[in-house]
Amino acid sequence: MANILILNGASRKNGNTAAIIKAFSEGAVSAGNQVREFYLQTMNIHGCLGCEGCSRAGKGTDDPCVQKDDMSEINKAFMSADVVVFASPLYFWTISGPLMTAADRLYAQLRSLGYSKFPRKSVLLMTAGGSDYSQAVRWYETFERNLGWTNLGEVLGAGKAKEAERLGASIK
């Protein structure tokens, strides 16, 4: 069983991204996994200050960031997550602003732990009316590679609920 953390960067709570997350989650739960989703659009998460306060926090601290906003809750869930799912509609050929902000803020947690010493598995779920996901996929693959994470799969495009469900069910 895996603990799966979903960072939902969609602006529409019941849009295409929500549909693909729902299918993925149903598959994951059917395989015995636990899923926790954060809908970032309604959360109060500020951008990274670049102050390096996190570098002075103790290793493995639940929340090493000096900013105390809703990211604190995500940081705590991140510590016990085996799989991190980045879910977003395609905005201006990349991931949404809320998802980028949350991903940037993971810096505090990863900085205090030592980047490559906190291996995770990850998934990318994206939807769009268009089809050019290349910039978003490059961001995701760079993020993973630099952290030493393992890509479990990508589902790119609306209307791919079955594919998302199969991916979720494949996680053990």
Residue spans of the language-model regions?
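N-terminal beta1-alpha1-beta2 submodule of the flavodoxin-like/Rossmannoid cofactor-binding fold
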Residues: 1-87, 93-108, 112, 152, ...
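Cofactor-binding loop segments of dinucleotide-utilizing enzymes, especially the Rossmann-like FAD-
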Residues: 9, 40, 126-130, 156-157
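Short glycine-rich anion-binding loops that position phosphate/pyrophosphate groups of nucleotides
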Residues: 90-92, 129-130
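Short, glycine-/small-residue-rich phosphate/pyrophosphate-handling segment
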Residues: 97-98, 111-154
